[in-house]
């Protein structure tokens, strides 16, 4: 043999083994320094097989190296270190480098103050106190950090990257999953191509979501904390943002996006949950909260323009501080409210509540139910009010209350089933009551006031001329300034 190794019989293994030249057998007085390294020699029927030991050695500081080009520090700085593999290099005390071109370099302060590093795998690099790099082409730089997987990369202290091409670029980062990336301080990234911190591609940049094409300048300049992305291709950026679910995206400070997306690859995830406004919240499949303090909850819910609320399926709140709740409810006016199914609210400070209700006038109120294939509840005049099934208030300050009632002139008021007030400032009170003249008033079932400034009071009472008056059941005033008082009374002027 040579000056470094010798062959002895191992009673425990029941075979010949290669050990250090200074090793002793069981009966020796000195302790064996290195036991059973490299290989055993097995006896064969036709004779024995020879074994050629690779280059290697043990230093006076108990540092072990094995392999062509393997190196350790022979001084006290390299005590108890191990380098195994071609061109492997274990640079500091208690560091371990195993694999071709692997490098392990811990932190050495003094003979009694040091922390090793561990690098296992071809072309791995572990640099820093207590660092661990496992895989092929894995790189870990930063004290107490861990990188596991092919081409995993850790850049700063106290971080973890686990998975093929995973990245942990700042301190306190946890990235787990193939191509997962944590680019902000304290970021959490869990899932395939999940990204926390530094929006390096956005909606139209790097649509393939590949770490190899991430914008390095953006990563390095990102200085915000606490983003968390969990799920397939989830993205959280902006500082304290949270994205949970497939393709969920929280892209502003303190934004929250929870929900799934579609698509089989990174380029066709067009339907995804997104919270892009500061302190915005989007929850549900394809829900979107676009501006500051927006809240969107439900499948395809959409809130935009700031402080907007959209809750339900396919609901929209596109006006500032607007509220839309229900099913296919749409609110586009500022500070407006829409609650119910198939709601349309397009004016400022308007309110629409019910089924098939439209409030399109500023400050208008529509409450009730439309009919399938029939009329909707419509409050289209400014400050108009429509309450009841199929009611209509389409003029400024018009009021329609009661099923099928209509207030269709400025200041007109219709109260009662199928009542109509079509004259300016006219009033119709009662079922089927009608006031069609300007300033006309009809009170009673089927009462009718068609003359300007006319008044009809009583069931079927009728005042048909200007300033006429009919009071009583079926009373009729037909002439200008005429008066009919009493049941069945008539007056022609």
Spans of features found by a protein language model:
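Glycine- and small/polar-enriched repetitive beta-structure motifs of secreted/surface proteins
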Residues: 4, 9-13, 17-24, 32-41, ...
